[in-house]
């Protein structure tokens, strides 16, 4: 399995996201890798680390998640790899749940989400987003 971190989805990935999705809630598993130092597209000066810039984004996302009926299910720092092998570990894992794929898209289009997303881009070196559906409680 080849793993490639990204910050922006490809056209093919976006087309899949815009297609009709599963009925009901989805959960997005986010594997996050932060930059050592935040880097803003507008070249603003900053002393923030990537994790600090992403934390600004995260605080704003909590508000926009609630507006579309979503919620943060889990968030934690990666401490070690228990099984398998990767070249480099992610820094953090977060799982957000949305009422539907359409609700996630609605959130991404909110003006306040657009405003805070600059901190996401500034802080992330890469990310994997894994959509899950049909949650099962074991």
Predicted regions and their residues:
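Short, Lys/Arg-rich amphipathic alpha-helical interaction segments
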Residues: 95-138
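Short S/T/G/P-rich N-terminal loop/turn motif that feeds into the first structured element of a domain
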Residues: 1-92, 99-103, 133-138
